[in-house]
Amino acid sequence: MIERIAILGTGLLGTSVGLALRAAGFRGAITGWNRGAEGAQVALAAKAIDSIAADPLQAARESDVTVLAVPIYATLDLMEQLGPILGCDHLVTDVGSTKRKICEAAARLFNQRDRAAFLPGHPMAGKERGGAALGDAGLFRGAVWLFTDDPAAERSAHSAALVKAWREWVAAMGSKTIDLDPVRHDELVAWVSHLPQFVATALSALLQDEVGDAPELKDVGGRGLREMTRLGASPFSMWRDIAYTNTEAVQTALLALEQRLAHLRENLRTPVLRDEFEQANRFRRE
């Protein structure tokens, strides 16, 4: 059913998708495109893709499935260009970390009888640093891959079959698939993905202010410090779009954390501190 795949964006996720597909047994053609030529060359050398496309739109036209593996606003831009030129024999999917704006664009540009299908996706997998050189065939193994499909989508029999086939390949890559409403998706990931990132960013920035001129003090913190600040190495270029497209949900989560920290600060010498540790321990056990 799926013989040709175009991966638009050969950074960490795009390259990992190509490698994971090969590891899962995909034998069709995989074409890659990247805004920066070096990323595509690295993906090609790693055998995540078979060829490099000069034009992303042409690569999409010549494929059965197009995977958008670029930041969210770049995804939205590509959707605007692809929607009018792809027919009902095509599937477009993405790996973006927020879904509401992408689903709104998909309803307007895709999922109509004479147009390509669009399946919004979000693999809950990644690393603190990006780039094709860090591509990993096992990145999605054991991870959750979220879908926020529109139950009212109108699809041809062929594009519906492509959707089913892509879901099967995601499972073959080792992921567990879960379907969510896009609004609920964005609320949920604000807590379980975006909040941890912004906590790590704030903590790392604070420590840089406090001890950045004494790098030997970083070693004093040991493993706990390294684990808490690992995500502080994440690139702004990716998280900017997440912050811009999920602002309200992230603000809600950050405000709740601010209030919790204030509560903790005020109870450092009361029995409430034990309650907080017990609640935290319960979360880690369950």
Cite the ranges covered by each PLM segment:
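NAD(P)+-binding Rossmann beta1-loop-alpha1 motif at the extreme N-terminus of oxidoreductases
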Residues: 1-62
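Phosphate-coordination loops involved in phosphoryl transfer and adenosine-cofactor binding
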Residues: 2-4, 89, 142
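N-terminal Rossmann-like NAD(P) cofactor-binding module of classical short-chain dehydrogenase/reductase
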Residues: 66-67, 93
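Glycine-rich, N-terminal phosphate-binding loop of Rossmann-like dinucleotide-binding domains
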Residues: 70-71, 96, 149
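Rossmann-like NAD(P)(H) cofactor-binding subdomain of soluble oxidoreductases
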Residues: 78-133
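Internal alpha-helical scaffold of NAD(P)-dependent oxidoreductase catalytic cores
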Residues: 139-230
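Interdomain hinge/lid region at the active-site interface
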Residues: 213-281
